[in-house]
Design a protein with these regions (language model features):
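Membrane-embedded alpha-helices of multi-pass transport/permease systems
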Residues: 29-36, 90-94, 98-120, 147, ...
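Transmembrane alpha-helix signature in integral membrane proteins
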Residues: 9-40, 150, 154
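Cytoplasmic-entry segments and transmembrane alpha-helices of multi-pass inner-membrane transporters
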Residues: 37-74, 96, 101, 106-110, ...
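Structural signal for alpha-helical transmembrane segments and their membrane-water exit/capping regions
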Residues: 1, 35-44, 79-81
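Short helix-to-coil transition segments within interhelical loops
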Residues: 112-142
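Transmembrane alpha-helices
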Residues: 17, 21, 130-154
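Loop-to-helix entry region at the N-terminal start of transmembrane alpha-helices
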Residues: 11, 15-19, 64, 68-103
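Periplasmic/extracellular loop-to-transmembrane helix junction in inner-membrane transport proteins
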Residues: 1-23, 49-57
């Protein structure tokens, strides 16, 4: 009996690694820019767009507050539309991605907030554009924290 369960372990481990890897890659590709956008459009930030920030923040907060099992059941039709099935390893990736995107976005936003505002002011005084501030000041300074936060999500 134990040997039968042991035989299933490599396949189950492979499926788990597949689900985690794909969902983290896709969720990070969407969540990191979303987190940057959440920070950049905030009050007293480089792109200050109050309505966009409040809307994005509300969506992120709403999705983060839904328990995963309820989210998984609620998006079964969407999962069927994307994958063609609502069961299986590949079908489980869709709700994992949807649940991970807001979490990653909020963690990235938090990491970016840790960058001292004096660095942003210095870049602004030297004539940097909002894109340059994000790419050359915020992201490099926050990268160690972002990587640490992403390992938490995994």
């Amino acid at each position: 009996m134990f040997s039968d369960a042991l035989m299933l372990l490599p396949k189950a481990l492979g499926e788990t690694v597949y689900m985690v890897a794909v969902s983290m890659i896709v969720a990070s590709a969407i969540g990191i820019p979303l987190g940057v956008l959440l920070l950049a459009t905030g009050k007293n930030q480089v792109l200050e767009l109050g309505i966009a920030n409040k809307t994005l923040s509300a969506i992120v907060n709403c999705v983060r507050s839904i328990p995963f099992i309820i989210l998984m059941v609620a998006i079964i039709p969407f999962t069927r539309l994307i994958v063609g099935s609502s069961i299986g390893t590949t079908a489980a990736i869709v709700p994992l991605i949807i649940a991970s995107i807001p979490l990653i976005a909020r963690l990235v936003e938090t990491s970016l907030r840790e960058v001292p505002y004096g660095l942003i002011e210095a870049a602004l005084s030297m004539g940097a554009t909002p894109y340059q501030i994000i790419r050359r000041v915020l992201l490099p300074k926050a990268m160690p924290s972002i990587v640490a936060q992403l390992t938490t999500v995994i």
